[in-house]
C-alpha cells in the first residue's frame, strides 16, 4: 500500500543540493521520512547514489539497526515489484557495508584506518567503563601524591580552597567532572586557556560588556518583570477600592521605576537606576478602605521592596573596579585548577598508553585530530554524497565539529532531523543551541532550508490538545529554549477508527493529585518512600480500573479494537532510583505483572549490601559498620544481645578488637565468635591467591548465601543480582588491575559517584507486563496508555550548590575562598553561571515533560503527590497570564512539573475543583482539550492498601481446605483468627508528646493512626564562617527573640539603648549570631517592659525563664473520643515555659509569640493557643505546688496582651 506523504514530508524527501534542517515534532514520522529520502536518493533515475556513499549517523546502536532494517525492507519491497532491476539488488548487497552507524562508531572507524597519523599503537583497544575509571583513579592518586611531595604551591592553594572536609575527595570529584566536561568540547586545551585569560582581567576589560554581566542582567530582568506583574495586580485592585487613592498613585509610580529597570540597556544604567530607587512611606488610608485589600497590597509591596534591596546588595554595591579586583583575585586558583587538569590529562594518557587502551572520549578527539588533516578530510568529503544526522538536537559541540569538517559547502549536503523540544541529554553534553542556531537562521528558501513536520500521527486528538494546551502556556524561548507558537504546535494526523462501544470522556486526560499529610517533609527518605508507595498504589488501582472498565485500544495488526493488555501500559518516571523499585514492589503485591527498566537500586538490595560488606571485612576487618552488617546477616546470625555482649568486651576499641577478646570466652558466644574469626582468616588467605571472580563464587557456595537468597521472596531476582556482581568481578579481572583491595575500592567508587549497575531482571520487557521506565529511556518509543507519575517531586537543583560551576560558553565559576579567614562566598562569575545553568536545567526539565506527555497514543494519566492542595492551588491561581502564556517569572519559580501543569490548568473550564480550592473565579478559557482531576488523600490510600493486604491474606486462608480438620481444633483456629484485641487503640497511642503536638491534635479533634514524633525541633547554631546573607526564617527570628528574652539581665537598663548593648554582649559571648542580633527588634522588647504586665514582671521577687517540664496526663484528656477504659492510660507531656513570676504567693504565666497577626484576628489567636496555655498552667501548678492565678500571651508583632 502506497504511503500518503504530507506536502512537508514530500518536500523533506525530495529536496536536493541544500543543507536541510527538518524540525520534526513527536510522532511526525521522521524515521519514515529519513528512510524514504535515502531510498529516493539511491533509486533516483537521473543521479542515483550508491548507498555506501551515504553517511547516516544515529544516536544509538539500536536506532542504527532499526534504520538498516527499514531500508532493507523498502529495498526488498521494491525488488519484489521490479525483480529485473539490477541496481536495487546491488543496493541490497551494498547495504551491508553502508555507513549507518552512531557517531562514535564512525569516529572509531576513522581512527582505526588512520592511526598512523597519531602516536597510537595499531593494536589499541577501547577500554570499558570499569577499566578506564580505575585508570583515572590510579592516575589521580599518583598525581596528588607527587604534587604533595613537591609542595606544589598552586596545588596546595587548590586543596586549601576546595579540598573539602574529607581529605581530597571533593577536589578529586571536581577534577573528574570538569575533566569529563571539557572533553566533550572540540578543543579542550584552547577552551581552558580562554577561561584562564578571562580571569587575567586585562586593561581593556569591562565587566559591563562581559558575557557574565549580560547573563545576570537578563535573569534579574525576568525576576523584576515578575515583581512588576505583582504590582500590576495590586494596582488593578487599588483602582477598584475606595479610600486607597494615595496607595494607588504611589504604586503606579513605583511600578514605573520597575519598568525603567527592565528597559535598562546596560549594567551601569541598571546600577544607577536601582541605586536611585527609594520606597516612600505609605500614606494613611481612609477608614472606608477595605482592611483585607489594604493588608494584601501592603504585603506585596513589602516583598517587592525586600527583593529589590536584595538584588541591589548582592550585585550592585561594588563599583566596576572592585568587581575587576575580585575576578583577578581568582586567577591564581583558576591557573592552579587548569594546570591540574592538564597534568591529570597527561598522567591519565600515559596510563592508557601503557595498557594499550583508549577511552570513549578519545575516539571523538582522535577522529577530530585526524580529520584536521586536509588529505584525510578531502577523502571523506569526496566519499559521502550526503550526510544524514538523526536526533540532531542531541549533538554535542565536538560531534558538530567533526561532521562540519566532512560536510561539503558546494553544494551543501547535510540533512539534519530532530526536535529541539525533545533535547533531553544535556547531562551527556548534548547542546540544543546547535539545533536552535540553525532553526533560527535557516529559512524556507536558499542553500540552508528549514522544513517543519508538526503533524502527529501517533496520538489521539485528546492527547494532542492536552499537550498543546500545557506547553503553549509554559514553554518559551527563554525557558524551554523554543517558543511554543502556532508553528511549533502539534497537529492531529492520526486516523483512529471510531469505537461504537466507547464511553463518553473515556479518553479524557486524567490528573490524579494525592494530598500528603501535613508537616511531612518531601526530602526525608522515609517519607519519600511513603509517597512513592502511595503513588504506586494509586497507579496500580487505576491500572486495575482500566481492566474493570473494559478499556479498549486500537490494534493496527487486527485492524480494530481489542481489550487492554498489561503490555499496552507504561509508567514513566523522571528518576527511577528508588521510585522504580517502589512501583515494582507495589505492583507485585497488587498482582500486576511488571518490568522495571532501571539502572539504579542495585547497591541498595539486601543481598548485594551484605556481600559487599563481607568483601570489605575480608579486605579490612577494622571497619565497624560493614563488620556489624556481616555479623547480623544470615551468614552468621549474631543477635543484638550477643553483639552488645561482644561490645562490652572492649567498649573503646573497634568491633574487631572486641571480637578477638570475646573469642577467649568459654561459653556458647565465645564458640560462635571463634567460628567467625576462623572463617574470616580462611577467606583472607584464599583472597590473596584467588582471582576476585572465582573467590566471590567460592564465598557464595562456602557461606550458602546464594542458596539462602534463592529461598527468599523474589529469590530468582536476588540470585540474578549476585550473578551480576560475579560478572562485574569477572570483567574487573580482565583488566590490568588485580586483587580484592582494588576491587572493593572500585565498587565503593561506583557507589559514591552514583554509578549504579542496575538490578538483574528475571522478567522480559516483551512479555505481557506493565513497563516502568525513565522518561529518558522512553524517548523514541510509544505506548497506548502512558501514566506519568512522580510529578510532584521537586526539581533537582543540587548541582547549583557545588563550589565550582562550569559552562561551555561562560567558562568556570568558582566560589571565592579566603581559606585563612575560613570565609567563602559565590564570586560574581559563579553567580552568572549559576543563573545560566538554572535556566538551562529548567528548560531541559520542560523538554523532559514534553517527551513524557507525547509518548501516549490513546490515554494519558498524570499523577503527583502534593502537600496541602488548597495552598498549592492558590499558588497556581496567582500565576500571571500574559496573553496565552504564564509569565516567565512564575514558570521560573515553579519547583516541580505539577506546578507547571497546575498553573496552566487552573483556568481551564474542566478544572472547577482546583479553582474552588484556590478560591478564585478567573475568566475561563474555552479550549478543546478535555481534563479530569481526582483528589486522593494519602491516609485513605494507606488504609485502603492495608485492607487490600488483609483481604489477600483472608483469600489465601479461605482457599485452604479446613473440612478435614478436627471440629474442636477448627473452632479454636477460627476463634483465634477472629479475635479482636480490646485495647487496640493503646498500640497507636504515643508514649510522649510535645505541647505543640497536643495542641494540633486537640484543635483538629483527630487521632493520628501513626506514631507522632516525640522530639521538638531545635535550630542549631550555624558556624560563623558558614553563615550566609539569606535572612532568617520566621521560626529562626522567633528563636532569636526568645533567646534574648531568656538571657536579658532584668536588673540592667531596659531602655532601647540598654537592650541593644545587652544584645551586643550576647553576640560577643556567642549566645547570638550577628544575623540573629540584626533581626531582634529592641524597640518591641522595650515596649513590652513598659506595659502593665512587663512592669509587674520587673517588680516581682522571683522570675523564672525558659523552664522545661515533663508531666503525665491521662490519654483521654488528649484523645477525647477514647472509651473510659483508657482513663488509666497515661502519656508523658514535655514542653518549655517561656516565663513566670511569683506575686503574693501565686504565679503569673507569660508565653511570648512572634507570629504575624492579621488585624481583627486576636480571638483566633486566643483559641489557637488555649490548649497550650492551659497545659502550661497545669504543668506549672504540678511542679511548683503553687496556684497559677493568671495566664497571658504577649504578641510582639502588635504589642498585644491576651489574658486567659
UniProtKB/Swiss-Prot annotation:
Where does the source fall among the domains of life?
Bacteria
Query: What keywords sit in the KW lines?
Result: ATP-binding, DNA damage, DNA repair, DNA-binding, Exonuclease, Helicase, Hydrolase, Isomerase, Nuclease, Nucleotide-binding
Q: Does the keyword Magnesium apply?
A: no
Has keyword rRNA processing? no
What reaction does this enzyme carry out catalytically?
Answer: Couples ATP hydrolysis with the unwinding of duplex DNA by translocating in the 3'-5' direction; ATP + H2O = ADP + phosphate + H(+)
EC number(s)? 3.1.-.-, 5.6.2.4
The UvrD-like helicase ATP-binding domain is annotated at 3-460
Q: Which GO terms describe its molecular function?
A: 3'-5' DNA helicase activity; 3'-5' exonuclease activity; ATP binding; ATP hydrolysis activity; double-stranded DNA binding
Domain UvrD-like helicase C-terminal residues, every copy = 492-780
Q: Which cofactor does it need?
A: Mg(2+)
One of its GO biological process terms is:
double-strand break repair via homologous recombination
Residues annotated to bind ATP = 24-31
Mind telling me which Pfam families this protein's record contains? PDDEXK_1, UvrD-helicase, UvrD_C
List GO terms (cellular component aspect): cytosol; DNA helicase complex
Its function, per the record, reads: The heterodimer acts as both an ATP-dependent DNA helicase and an ATP-dependent, dual-direction single-stranded exonuclease. Recognizes the chi site generating a DNA molecule suitable for the initiation of homologous recombination. The AddA nuclease domain is required for chi fragment generation; this subunit has the helicase and 3' -> 5' nuclease activities.
- How is the subunit organization of this protein annotated in UniProt? Heterodimer of AddA and AddB/RexB.
Give the family per the record: Belongs to the helicase family. AddA subfamily.
Q: Check the record and name the HAMAP family matching this protein.
A: AddA (MF_01451)
Name recorded for this polypeptide: ATP-dependent helicase/nuclease subunit A
Organism listed in the record? Caldanaerobacter subterraneus subsp. tengcongensis (strain DSM 15242 / JCM 11007 / NBRC 100824 / MB4)
Amino acid at each position: 500500500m502506497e504511503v500518503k506523504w504530507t506536502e512537508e514530508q514530500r518536500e523533506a524527501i525530495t529536496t536536493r543540493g541544500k543543507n536541510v534542517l527538518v524540525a520534526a515534532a513527536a510522532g511526525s514520522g521522521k524515521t519514515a521520512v529519513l528512510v524514504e529520502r535515502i531510498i529516493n536518493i539511491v533509486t533516483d533515475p537521473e543521479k542515483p547514489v550508491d548507498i555506501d556513499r551515504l553517511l547516516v549517523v544515529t544516536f544509538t546502536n539500536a536506532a542504527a539497526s532499526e534504520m538498516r532494517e527499514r531500508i532493507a525492507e523498502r529495498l526488498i519491497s521494491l525488488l519484489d515489484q521490479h525483480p529485473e532491476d539490477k541496481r536495487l539488488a546491488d543496493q541490497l548487497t551494498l547495504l551491508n557495508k553502508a555507513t549507518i552507524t552512531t557517531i562514535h562508531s564512525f569516529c572509531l572507524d576513522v581512527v582505526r584506518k588512520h592511526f598512523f597519523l597519531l602516536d597510537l599503537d595499531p593494536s589499541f583497544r577501547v577500554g570499558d567503563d570499569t577499566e578506564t575509571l580505575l585508570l583515572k583513579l590510579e592516575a589521580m592518586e599518583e598525581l596528588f601524591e607527587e604534587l604533595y611531595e613537591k609542595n606544589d604551591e598552586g596545588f596546595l592553594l587548590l586543596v586549601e580552597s576546595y579540598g573539602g572536609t574529607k581529605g581530597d575527595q571533593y577536589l578529586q570529584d571536581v577534577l573528574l567532572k570538569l575533566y569529563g566536561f571539557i572533553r566533550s568540547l572540540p578543543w579542550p586545551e584552547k577552551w581552558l586557556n580562554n577561561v584562564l585569560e578571562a580571569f587575567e582581567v586585562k586593561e581593556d576589560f569591562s565587566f559591563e560588556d562581559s558575557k557574565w554581566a549580560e547573563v545576570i542582567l537578563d535573569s534579574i530582568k525576568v525576576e523584576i518583570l515578575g515583581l512588576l506583574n505583582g504590582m500590576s495586580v495590586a494596582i488593578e485592585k487599588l483602582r477598584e477600592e475606595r479610600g486607597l487613592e494615595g496607595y494607588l498613585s504611589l504604586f503606579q509610580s513605583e511600578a514605573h521605576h520597575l519598568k525603567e529597570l527592565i528597559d535598562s540597556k546596560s549594567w551601569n544604567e541598571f546600577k544607577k537606576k536601582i541605586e536611585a530607587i527609594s520606597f516612600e512611606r505609605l500614606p494613611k488610608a481612609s477608614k472606608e478602605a477595605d482592611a483585607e485589600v489594604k493588608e494584601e497590597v501592603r504585603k506585596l509591596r513589602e516583598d517587592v521592596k525586600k527583593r529589590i534591596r536584595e538584588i541591589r546588595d548582592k550585585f550592585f554595591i561594588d563599583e566596576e573596579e572592585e568587581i575587576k579586583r575580585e575576578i583577578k583575585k581568582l586567577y591564581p586558583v583558576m591557573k592552579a585548577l587548569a594546570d591540574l587538569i592538564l597534568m591529570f590529562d597527561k598522567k591519565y594518557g600515559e596510563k592508557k598508553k601503557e595498557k594499550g587502551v583508549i577511552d570513549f572520549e578519545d575516539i571523538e578527539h582522535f577522529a577530530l585530530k585526524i580529520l584536521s588533516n586536509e588529505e584525510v578530510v578531502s577523502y571523506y568529503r569526496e566519499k559521502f554524497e550526503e550526510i544524514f544526522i538523526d536526533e540532531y538536537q542531541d549533538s554535542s559541540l565536538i560531534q558538530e565539529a567533526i561532521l562540519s569538517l566532512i560536510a561539503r559547502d558546494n553544494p551543501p549536503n547535510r540533512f539534519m532531523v530532530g526536535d529541539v523540544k525533545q533535547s533531553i541529554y544535556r547531562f551527556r553534553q548534548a547542546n540544543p543551541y546547535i539545533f536552535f542556531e540553525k532553526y533560527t537562521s535557516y529559512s524556507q528558501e536558499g542553500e540552508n532550508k528549514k522544513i517543519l513536520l508538526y503533524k502527529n500521527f501517533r496520538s489521539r486528538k485528546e492527547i494532542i490538545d492536552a499537550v498543546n494546551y500545557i506547553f503553549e502556556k509554559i514553554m518559551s524561548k527563554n525557558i524551554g529554549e523554543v517558543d511554543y507558537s502556532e508553528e511549533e504546535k502539534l497537529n492531529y494526523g492520526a486516523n483512529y477508527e471510531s469505537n461504537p462501544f466507547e464511553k463518553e470522556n473515556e479518553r479524557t486526560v486524567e490528573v490524579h493529585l494525592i494530598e500528603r499529610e501535613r508537616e511531612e517533609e518531601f526530602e526525608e527518605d522515609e517519607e519519600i518512600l511513603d509517597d512513592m508507595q502511595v503513588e504506586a498504589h494509586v497507579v496500580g488501582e487505576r491500572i486495575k480500573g482500566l481492566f474493570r472498565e473494559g478499556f479498549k485500544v486500537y490494534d493496527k495488526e487486527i485492524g480494530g479494537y481489542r481489550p487492554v493488555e498489561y503490555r499496552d501500559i507504561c509508567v514513566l518516571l523522571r528518576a527511577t532510583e528508588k521510585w522504580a523499585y517502589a512501583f515494582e514492589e507495589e505492583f507485585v503485591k497488587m498482582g500486576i505483572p511488571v518490568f522495571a527498566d532501571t539502572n539504579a537500586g542495585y547497591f541498595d538490595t539486601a543481598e548485594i549490601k551484605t556481600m559487599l560488606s563481607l568483601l570489605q571485612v575480608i579486605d579490612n576487618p577494622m571497619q565497624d559498620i560493614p563488620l556489624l552488617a556481616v555479623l547480623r546477616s544470615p551468614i552468621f546470625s549474631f543477635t543484638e544481645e550477643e553483639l552488645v555482649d561482644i561490645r562490652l568486651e572492649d567498649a573503646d576499641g573497634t568491633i574487631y578488637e572486641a571480637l578477638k577478646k570475646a573469642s577467649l570466652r568459654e561459653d556458647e558466644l565465645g564458640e560462635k565468635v571463634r567460628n567467625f574469626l576462623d572463617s574470616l582468616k580462611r577467606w583472607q588467605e584464599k583472597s590473596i591467591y584467588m582471582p576476585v571472580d572465582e573467590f566471590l563464587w567460592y564465598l557464595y557456595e562456602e557461606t550458602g548465601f546464594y542458596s539462602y537468597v534463592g529461598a527468599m521472596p523474589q529469590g530468582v531476582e536476588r540470585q540474578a543480582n549476585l550473578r551480576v556482581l560475579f560478572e562485574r568481578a569477572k570483567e574487573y579481572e580482565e583488566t590490568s588491575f588485580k586483587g580484592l583491595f582494588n576491587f572493593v575500592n572500585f565498587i565503593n567508587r561506583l557507589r559514591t559517584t552514583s554509578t549504579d549497575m542496575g538490578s538483574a531482571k528475571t522478567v522480559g520487557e516483551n512479555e505481557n507486563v506493565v513497563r516502568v521506565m525513565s522518561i529518558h529511556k522512553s524517548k523514541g518509543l510509544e505506548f497506548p496508555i502512558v501514566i506519568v507519575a512522580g510529578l510532584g517531586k521537586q526539581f533537582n537543583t543540587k548541582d547549583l550548590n557545588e563550589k565550582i560551576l562550569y559552562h561551555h560558553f561562560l567558562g568556570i565559576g568558582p566560589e571565592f575562598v579566603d581559606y585563612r579567614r575560613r570565609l567563602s562566598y559565590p564570586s560574581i562569575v559563579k553567580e552568572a553561571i549559576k543563573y545560566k545553568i538554572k535556566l538551562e536545567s529548567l528548560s531541559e526539565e520542560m523538554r523532559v515533560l514534553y517527551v513524557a506527555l507525547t509518548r501516549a497514543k490513546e490515554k494519558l494519566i498524570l499523577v503527583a503527590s502534593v502537600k496541602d492542595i488548597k495552598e498549592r492551588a492558590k499558588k497556581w491561581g496567582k500565576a500571571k497570564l500574559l496573553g496565552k502564556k504564564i509569565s516567565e517569572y512564575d514558570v521560573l519559580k515553579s519547583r516541580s512539573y505539577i506546578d507547571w501543569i497546575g498553573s496552566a490548568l487552573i483556568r481551564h473550564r474542566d478544572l472547577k475543583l482546583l479553582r474552588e480550592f484556590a478560591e478564585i473565579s478567573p475568566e475561563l478559557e474555552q479550549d478543546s482539550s478535555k481534563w479530569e482531576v481526582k483528589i486522593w488523600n494519602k491516609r485513605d490510600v494507606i488504609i485502603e492498601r492495608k485492607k487490600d493486604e488483609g483481604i489477600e491474606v483472608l483469600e489465601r486462608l479461605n482457599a485452604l481446605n479446613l473440612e478435614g480438620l478436627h471440629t474442636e481444633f477448627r473452632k479454636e483456629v477460627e476463634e483465634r483468627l477472629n479475635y479482636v484485641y480490646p485495647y487496640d487503640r493503646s498500640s497507636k497511642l504515643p508514649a510522649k508528646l510535645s505541647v505543640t503536638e497536643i495542641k494540633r491534635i486537640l484543635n483538629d479533634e483527630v487521632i493520628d493512626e501513626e506514631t507522632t514524633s516525640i522530639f521538638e525541633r531545635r535550630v542549631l547554631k550555624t558556624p560563623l564562617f558558614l553563615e550566609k546573607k539569606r535572612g532568617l526564617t520566621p521560626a529562626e527570628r522567633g528563636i532569636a527573640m526568645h533567646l534574648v528574652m531568656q538571657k536579658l539581665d532584668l536588673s540592667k537598663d531596659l531602655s532601647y539603648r540598654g537592650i541593644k548593648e545587652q544584645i551586643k554582649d550576647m553576640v560577643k559571648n556567642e549566645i547570638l549570631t550577628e544575623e540573629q542580633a540584626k533581626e531582634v527588634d529592641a524597640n518591641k522588647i522595650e515596649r513590652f517592659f513598659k506595659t502593665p504586665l512587663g512592669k509587674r514582671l520587673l517588680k516581682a521577687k522571683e522570675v523564672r525563664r525558659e523552664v522545661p517540664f515533663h508531666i503525665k496526663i491521662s490519654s483521654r484528656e488528649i484523645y477525647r473520643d477514647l472509651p473510659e477504659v483508657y482513663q488509666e492510660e497515661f502519656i508523658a507531656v514535655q514542653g518549655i515555659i517561656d516565663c513566670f513570676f511569683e506575686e503574693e504567693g501565686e504565679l503569673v504565666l507569660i508565653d511570648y509569640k512572634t507570629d504575624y497577626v492579621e488585624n481583627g484576628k486576636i480571638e483566633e489567636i486566643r483559641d489557637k493557643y488555649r490548649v497550650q496555655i492551659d497545659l502550661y498552667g497545669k504543668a506549672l501548678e504540678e511542679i511548683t505546688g503553687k496556684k497559677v492565678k493568671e495566664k497571658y500571651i504577649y504578641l510582639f508583632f502588635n504589642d498585644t496582651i491576651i489574658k486567659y
